[in-house]
Amino acid sequence: MQDITKMIFPDWYQCRYDQDVLALANHLGRKKGKETFTFEDPEYVILEAGVDKDMAIVGLHLGIYVEKTVEEIAKEMNQPEDYVEEQLKKLAFYGVAFWNTDKKRNVDVFWAETWIPGTMEVIVNSQEN
C-alpha cells in the first residue's frame, strides 16, 4: 500500500534530485526524521517542476502560517532584499507561498501553509503552471 503514493516517471523524465527542493517539500509538510518525503513523493515532484534552487533556499525561510516581510527574510539569510523579494514573488506565483499586504504597516508579507489542505491544489490550479 505504501508504494501507491510513489510517482512513476516516464523513461524520458530526468529527475533533478535537488536536495533544497526536497528540503522545501519537507518544510511545507513539517516532516522530520524517518517520516520525511523522498524524491519519489508527489510533494517533491510537483515542486521540482517549477521551483529552482534559489527559490527553494528562500522558501525554507518562509514561516508556516507566520507572516514575514522581505526585510525579515533577507536579514535571516544575509541576502539583498531585492533578490529575496524576487524569489518570494516567484514562489507566490507558482503557488508555494502566499503574498499579501499588511495594511497596518503598509508592507508586503509572505508565508507558507502546509500541504494539507491546499498547497498542491493551488499549484495545480494555477493557469501559469
Spans of features found by a protein language model:
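Long, compositionally biased, glycine/small-hydrophobic-enriched stretches that function as flexible linkers
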Residues: M1-D11, Y17, K53, H61, ...
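Long, low-complexity, charged/polar intrinsically disordered regions in eukaryotic proteins
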Residues: M1-Y44
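Short acidic, hydrophobic short linear motifs in intrinsically disordered regions
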Residues: V58, I64-M77
